[in-house]
């Protein structure tokens, strides 16, 4: 039973890994305001070839973001020209406005025929993390296709989403589609660093008085075959994100010669401090959030006694927590995590270093705040010789609604059932990763993070790692999902007002 329970909980963790140059145009003509008939998501052989070639071309543009101060701006500009080239219908349609924001990000405004319907936003980003060639089976920016698999940096994070959004819209427009509900497409150029493009787009929309029905960004996946004897896939939609804090610890001492060292050096003091942090994890916060929801939904799929344990987390919380903290992934969803990422000290082998610095990254559980984690950290270190400098930080994101009246969540759920009929379990989760959507909480209470892609355990390592890849079939299905989602959003249903939950 213990082994089976660990497997179940491991599944839960995997999920968490889970502007302005303006070309203005007219909206749809008054005679075009009738509701369009449903367009089937069936693509010709020529269209399928064109869509995969478009993705491969996008991968070949090295839109690398190294830091908030350094990125490949030439490639970022080239990518803007590229989407104009491969999606001519999108950029030439009369009821679509395209704006370049913060020099390289892009905002598309698609004017719907029914102004009474609240608009929504689809998001993605086209910048990627660096990809040194060592360890790659093919050059990381080759976009090479082998046996139905496209390789390259950005195939999973997140050029596939960028291209799928525009590709789906292009195919709909070619079929004379006119949306009833207006929507926006936001493409960020620096999500992997500062997110200034997304911040500027959010501010721009707010200045125009826009309030959104919902937002869809990158996030959860469809997980399959993660647990022995559990063969049902599960779609995990992230309804929140953990917070984050980058904290620098610093020790200053008088420098000197190593032949007459002091009792403690700056390196020794700092090493002891970060060691205490690693050996004293933040408290477990199980609570009644998305983890409990997922466990309870999975409970019915298992026999006694696992089903009893999972369906009653309030009773078995100590047991479940003990199992979850044994695995790094499951541990990350029940507490704030502590990761030492940078250590700097010393300039010469015979010189006592005057300064030692260490940077620690905390991913903050929704049950805590930045200030609470900072105070806990100071108490754990308990050494007044160590200075603390917050480099960057933000609190956990609010939890978006996932009930029957949550329009965005239910549209995603409906589209999952349509495109992936074999998936009959959809659950809300909290993402341990962060996205550009965190800059849009001023525009909606419904922010959802979801990749319409099946993911395997080894695929997580490829995101930001070597040999990132996506199958042609998976990408085609991603395009199909967006194609269907846009049409599903033309419902008369409107979102019910929700307050953000923390």
Curated annotation (Swiss-Prot):
Glycans are attached at residue 252. Zn(2+) 1 binds at residues 157, 192, 464. Zn(2+) 2 binds at residues 125, 157, 217. It catalyses: an N-acyl-L-amino acid + H2O = an L-alpha-amino acid + a carboxylate; an N-acyl-aromatic L-alpha-amino acid + H2O = an aromatic L-alpha-amino acid + a carboxylate; L-phenylalanine + (9Z)-octadecenoate = N-(9Z-octadecenoyl)-L-phenylalanine + H2O; N-(9Z-octadecenoyl)-L-leucine + H2O = L-leucine + (9Z)-octadecenoate. GO terms for cellular component: extracellular exosome; extracellular region. Its EC number is 3.5.1.114, 3.5.1.14. Lipoproteins are powerful coactivators of PM20D1 activity in vitro and NAA biosynthesis in vivo. It is found in: Secreted. It comes from the Eukaryota. It holds the Pfam family M20_dimer. GO terms for biological process: adaptive thermogenesis; amide biosynthetic process; amide catabolic process; amino acid metabolic process; energy homeostasis; fatty acid metabolic process; lipid metabolic process; proteolysis. Its main location: secreted. Binds 2 Zn(2+) ions per subunit. It is an enzyme of class 3 (hydrolase). The active site is at residues 127, 191. CDD domains: M20_yscS (cd05674). Secreted enzyme that regulates the endogenous N-fatty acyl amino acid (NAAs) tissue and circulating levels by functioning as a bidirectional NAA synthase/hydrolase. It condenses free fatty acids and free amino acids to generate NAAs and bidirectionally catalyzes the reverse hydrolysis reaction. Some of these NAAs stimulate oxidative metabolism via mitochondrial uncoupling, increasing energy expenditure in a UPC1-independent manner. Thereby, this secreted protein may indirectly regulate whole body energy expenditure. Genetically increasing or decreasing the expression of PM20D1 reduces and aggravates Alzheimer's disease (AD) related pathologies, respectively. These findings suggest that in a particular genetic background, PM20D1 contributes to neuroprotection against AD. This is N-fatty-acyl-amino acid synthase/hydrolase PM20D1. It comes from Homo sapiens (Human).
